């Protein structure tokens, strides 16, 4: 698979994990509208297509390269996609009935968010 597809799939996975932190603790009210849109896209099986379409949008009239697209998502897109509505279900599925496991998942998500912010601020 191409680096663009692999990068996009990784971002979908990471953003899905980070979603639960934002929606559960921080962004339920602020991001309800964005979350609803992303949830509908996800439920319709269109999340991947939505991300791919974003990658090939033009920026100042110049088509983005695959590398630039992945960089954009790592810097900014991950934070935006994390406002989706699917995260709590994912945490419940991964964590089962163990509160400890769920806490570990939340800690990982917080770290992902901090890394994303650091990458964004660095650029």
UniProtKB/Swiss-Prot annotation:
Its main location: membrane. The keyword Membrane applies. Residues 1-20 form the signal peptide. It is a lipid-anchor; GPI-anchor. GO terms for cellular component: plasma membrane; side of membrane. Keywords: Cell membrane, Glycoprotein, GPI-anchor, Lipoprotein, Membrane, Signal. A lipid is attached at residue 96 (GPI-anchor amidated glycine). Residues 97-123 form a propeptide. It is found in: Cell membrane. This is Uncharacterized GPI-anchored protein SPAC750.07c.
């Amino acid at each position: 698979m191409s680096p663009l597809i692999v990068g996009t799939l990784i971002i979908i996975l990471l953003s899905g994990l980070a979603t639960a932190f934002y929606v559960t603790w921080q962004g339920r009210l602020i991001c309800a509208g964005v979350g609803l849109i992303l949830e509908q896209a996800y439920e319709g099986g269109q999340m991947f297509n939505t991300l791919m379409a974003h990658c090939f949008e033009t920026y100042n009239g110049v088509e983005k390269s695959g590398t630039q697209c992945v960089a954009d998502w790592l810097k900014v897109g991950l934070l935006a996609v994390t406002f989706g509505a699917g995260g709590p279900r994912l945490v419940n599925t991964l964590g089962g009935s163990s509160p400890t496991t769920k806490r570990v998942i939340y800690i990982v998500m917080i770290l992902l968010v901090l890394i994303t912010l650091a990458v964004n601020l660095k650029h």
